[in-house]
């Protein structure tokens, strides 16, 4: 390998993103309140479709308890659940009969109140266009129990879904971040060597440290989840996603001139 090839091998060729507090900013939320809003929307939809629903409070709390129990188990097993599948199983046991599209809409109604809280960098589309203009591959690697259909509908509403050729959600796997296996699969799917991949996330423990260990170039996105914490050595920190094009150009220019 000649010198030019070595320097090119240090350049960024792909960027992987986390979702929550990275591409989509939710901030601090009130989970039970948001859950009740989702329960009300889904309950009303069931009633409008003539499905068996019973008392609202029972409907709300029985679903909440079931989800919290599964979430507790997932924290032990380190495997995220697919909340949509769980809600469908609960509904089917109660006699609800929907086709696939109705179940997807049902799941979206549970997620919709949370989606309305999300904001994005005002320049996010411009930023992603710039990154694609640099010839970079873009992807998503996120820990989540929200079904892909709901997440991707949400991203589509913000006009950013189609920028990402690779989309990986932890509930689709038997492990989640910070497990190295999910990062290795991301390397395979994005089709670039680890040292040529930048990973952008908000969690030091689940995003930045494992990204460093596998050889990525990690970037910590400022968020309430890392407020007051020290950025690990070897990582960069940004306040806004819109800072990425300039940072990547700087890193790649240094690599090319080395």
Which positions does each model-derived feature cover?
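Asp-based, Mg2+/Mn2+-dependent phosphohydrolase catalytic module
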Residues: 2-15, 48-54, 125, 129-132, ...
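N-terminal helical cap/lid subdomain that shapes the substrate entry/recognition surface
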Residues: 10-134
């Amino acid at each position: 390998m000649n010198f030019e090839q070595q320097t090119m091998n240090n350049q960024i060729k792909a960027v992987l993103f986390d979702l929550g507090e990275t591409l989509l900013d939710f901030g601090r939320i009130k989970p039970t309140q948001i859950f009740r809003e989702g329960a009300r929307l889904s309950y009303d939809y069931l009633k409008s479709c003539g499905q068996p629903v019973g008392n609202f409070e029972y409907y709300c709390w029985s679903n909440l308890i079931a989800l919290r129990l599964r979430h507790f188990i997932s924290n032990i097993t380190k495997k995220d659940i697919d909340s949509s599948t769980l809600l469908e199983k609960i509904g089917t046991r109660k006699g609800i009969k929907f086709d696939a599209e109705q179940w997807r809409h049902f799941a979206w109604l549970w997620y919709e109140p949370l989606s309305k809280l999300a904001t994005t960098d005002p320049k996010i589309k411009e930023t992603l266009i710039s990154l694609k203009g640099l010839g970079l591959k873009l992807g998503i690697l996120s820990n989540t129990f929200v079904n892909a259909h709901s997440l991707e509908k949400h991203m589509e509403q913000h006009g950013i879904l189609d920028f990402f050729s690779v989309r990986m959600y932890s509930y689709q796997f038997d492990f989640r971040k910070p497990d190295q296996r999910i990062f290795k699969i991301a390397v395979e799917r994005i089709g670039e060597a680890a040292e040529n991949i930048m990973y952008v996330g908000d969690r030091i423990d689940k995003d930045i440290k494992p990204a460093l260990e596998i050889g990525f170039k990690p970037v910590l996105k400022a968020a309430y989840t890392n407020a007051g914490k020290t950025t690990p050595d070897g990582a960069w920190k940004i306040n806004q996603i819109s800072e990425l094009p300039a940072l990547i150009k700087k890193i790649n220019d240094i690599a090319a001139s080395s």
